[in-house]
Design a protein with these regions (language model features):
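Secretory targeting and sorting signals
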Residues: 1-10
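Catalytic loop of the DD-peptidase/beta-lactamase superfamily, centered on the K-T-G motif
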Residues: 9-53, 245-386
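Hydrophobic (often cysteine-bearing) scaffold residues that line and stabilize catalytic clefts
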Residues: 20, 73, 77, 81, ...
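Residue-level preference for non-acidic, small/hydrophobic
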Residues: 28, 47, 81, 85, ...
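Short active-site loop at a secondary-structure junction
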Residues: 35-37, 61-122, 170-179, 262
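N-terminal carbohydrate-binding/catalytic regions of secreted carbohydrate-active enzymes
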Residues: 43-59, 63-64, 72
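Short, surface-exposed loop or secondary-structure junction motifs
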Residues: 112-327
């Protein structure tokens, strides 16, 4: 399998730079037997920028992931949306304590769901208790269903109505549970408050000011602008268990209508642009100090999040993950064909972005399962110099 370090943009040229490149290269290669078709890693540190890639962006042609590949960032969309909401808060258009009912009257109602008891803060923090709309879209997670519905359009309004078929997971503010419904509503709130679509507001407030020229908010468009790796997807087969999903053969899932993710997960970007965004966000270039402090005020997570990232806490569209040198801010993303992982140090001086062209990893026989998330060691090595 191919594993190549980039040679450009290394300003130090010393032993430390070569050592970091070798370490990150080895970490990227280690993801291949875990089931990654291809890996692209981008590390930014003071005076240094390095990229490493491993495996293939196209398994048929045996070509590598392009250095400047665009990819679907999945739930890394959420910090873009949260930052946009927080800018509106800072401008006085609403507050974090504004209820959903005040902005979107009658939208969150039924089966015990009550928008008058849920605040904007609770949406962004996943403490609303709102059920997950994706449980009403099981076709996304089967081979036949995905092939039949991959080009369907799903609006945020439709997604929220699907969620309202279920009772809340808990009373607002009493617990934590990751639910994409929260961010569908956040996008709707942006539109109600601003009078523009959530995509227009994200472009106007974040994409254009930061010069994120490689970032696309696709809406219902099914393709990814070139260059890009093929996104591979596997689906659980008959008799699947958590330990053995009995995956089908991988299919090309690159072309799909991402509207089912909407403001919860449909953005397309690159390692350069996503790092520029996170560094600007943590560096205080997008939010006023008060709103950034609110974004970084965290609550404990639970369930699978703690299994993947022990000690993880969640703020307003940002996750804090402990590591060997303290911790980092992060938000991963998984969407059909693509997995994104990242981290940025608390001072914003070191950051790393990892793109894998599948979100369904199938380990090779005899390869042990990772402890926690599959990219944990790589991200730790990138952010925590030895």
């Amino acid at each position: 399998m191919l594993a190549t370090p980039a040679t450009a943009d290394d300003d130090t040229g010393g032993h430390d730079a070569r050592g970091l490149t070798a370490t990150v290269k080895a970490d990227a290669e280690a993801l291949l037997p875990q089931g990654a078709p291809g890996v692209l890693v981008d590390v930014r540190t003071p005076g240094r920028s390095l990229k490493v890639r491993a495996g293939y962006g196209n398994l048929t042609d045996k070509t590598p992931v392009p250095w400047n590949a665009r990819f679907r960032i999945g739930s890394l969309t959420k910090p873009f949306v949260a930052a946009t909401v927080l800018q509106l808060v800072g401008e006085g258009h609403l507050s974090l304590d504004t209820t959903v009912e005040e902005v979107l009257p009658g939208v969150v109602r039924g089966n015990g769901n009550d928008g008058s008891r849920i605040t904007v803060r609770q949406l962004l923090q996943h403490t609303s208790g709102l059920p997950e709309y994706l449980q009403e879209m099981p076709h996304l997670f089967t081979l036949d269903g995905f092939e039949e519905h991959r080009f369907d359009t799903v609006t945020p309004q439709q997604a929220v109505r699907l969620a309202m078929r279920h009772e809340p997971d808990f009373a607002p503010g009493t617990s934590w549970n990751y639910s994409n419904t929260n961010y569908m509503l956040a996008g709707m709130i942006i539109e109600s408050v601003s009078g523009r679509t959530w995509q227009e507001e994200v472009r106007r407030r974040i994409v254009r000011p930061l010069g994120l020229t490689q970032t696309v908010l696709p809406g219902t468009r099914v393709g990814i602008p070139r260059p890009h790796a093929i996104g591979y997807e596997r689906f659980a087969g008959p008799g699947a268990t958590a330990e053995d999903p009995k995956y089908t053969e991988a299919i090309d899932a690159t072309r799909q209508n991402p509207s089912w993710g909407g403001p919860a997960g449909d953005i397309i970007s690159t390692t350069r642009d996503t790092q520029r965004f996170l560094r600007a966000l943590i560096g205080g270039k997008l939010l006023r100090p008060a709103e950034l402090a609110e974004m970084q005020r965290t609550v404990p997570t639970n369930g699978g999040f703690l299994s993947n990232w022990p000690g993880a806490r969640y703020g307003l569209g940002l996750m804090w993950i402990p590591n060997s040198c303290g911790g980092s801010w992060s938000h991963g993303g998984d969407i059909m064909g693509y997995m994104t992982r990242n981290g940025i140090s608390a001072d914003g001086r070191r950051s790393v972005m990892v793109s894998i062209n599948t979100d369904t990893l199938q380990r090779q026989p005899g390869v042990p399962a990772p402890v926690g998330d599959v990219t944990t060691e790589l991200i730790d090595h990138a952010l925590c110099p030895a």
